[in-house]
């Protein structure tokens, strides 16, 4: 799977061939630090003074490299696919090898950082339900509409939460059909490829 880099990212990465390979390696270290701790303008300003360029150019170069490394790590692309993705940028062979080495050295750490940054969504714990129906009424002028009351228990980071939901059976049936359709769709080849690339 090849990376699809936008023109903006290609422009940001176009600065890399203009500097020494040691500087590109340092940019790689800064890119990983950027993921860990966020942006640090002082680092950009110091590098800009040393290289006699604007700090925006340095920042864009680091951000472009960060994007290249994070997307490659997220998709777990192979060495060959990474080389092909970078080859499109028209860099020298030495720079391509350096970028590949940066990717191989940092991909596990980047995936760990991305997993830590991912939101922790609530997970299902248990479910209780009750069907409420009015059995009799002296002045019943409309059709009886039963209601389904659901008590949903969720876990999120060890915390338990309870949510009460109430709906009519027709809506619940529609919801069940939609969920079953989504589960069937997960069995398609396209969805399997997407899930594989996310892992």
From Swiss-Prot:
Keyword Nucleotide-binding part of the UniProt annotation: no
Keyword annotations of the record: Cytoplasm, Transcription, Transcription regulation, Ubl conjugation pathway
Family: Belongs to the COMM domain-containing protein 2 family.
Assembly: Component of the commander complex consisting of the CCC subcomplex and the retriever subcomplex. Component of the CCC (COMMD/CCDC22/CCDC93) subcomplex consisting of COMMD1, COMMD2, COMMD3, COMMD4, COMMD5, COMMD6, COMMD7, COMMD8, COMMD9, COMMD10, CCDC22 and CCDC93; within the complex forms a heterodimer with COMMD3. Interacts with RELA, RELB, NFKB1/p105, NFKB2/p100. Interacts with CCDC22, CCDC93, SCNN1B, CUL3, CUL4B, CUL5, CUL7.
Keyword Cytoplasm: yes
InterPro entries membership: COMM, Commd2
Domain COMM as annotated: residue spans: 123-190
Record function comment: Scaffold protein in the commander complex that is essential for endosomal recycling of transmembrane cargos; the commander complex is composed of the CCC subcomplex and the retriever subcomplex. May modulate activity of cullin-RING E3 ubiquitin ligase (CRL) complexes. May down-regulate activation of NF-kappa-B.
TM ranges: none
Pfam families: COMM_domain
Protein known as: COMM domain-containing protein 2
Any single GO CC term annotated in Swiss-Prot or TrEMBL for this entry: cytoplasm
Location(s) in or outside the cell: Cytoplasm
């Amino acid at each position: 799977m090849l990376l699809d880099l936008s023109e903006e990212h290609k422009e940001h990465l176009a600065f890399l061939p203009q500097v020494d390979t040691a500087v590109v390696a340092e940019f790689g270290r800064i890119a990983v630090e950027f993921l860990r701790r966020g942006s640090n303008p002082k680092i950009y300003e110091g590098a800009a003074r040393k290289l006699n360029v604007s700090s925006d150019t340095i920042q864009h170069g680091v951000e472009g490299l960060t994007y290249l490394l994070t997307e490659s790590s997220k998709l777990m692309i192979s060495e060959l696919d990474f080389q092909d993705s970078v080859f499109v940028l028209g860099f020298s062979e030495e720079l391509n090898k350096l970028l590949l080495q940066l990717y191989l050295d940092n991909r596990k750490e980047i995936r760990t950082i991305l997993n830590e940054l991912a939101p922790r969504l609530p997970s299902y714990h248990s479910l209780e339900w009750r069907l409420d129906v009015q059995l009799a009424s002296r002045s019943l002028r409309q059709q009886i509409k039963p209601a389904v009351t659901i008590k949903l228990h969720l876990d999120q980071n060890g915390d338990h939460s309870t949510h009460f939901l109430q709906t009519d059976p027709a809506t619940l049936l529609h919801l069940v059909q939609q969920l079953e359709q989504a589960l069937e769709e997960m069995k398609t080849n396209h969805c399997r490829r997407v899930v594989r690339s996310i892992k």
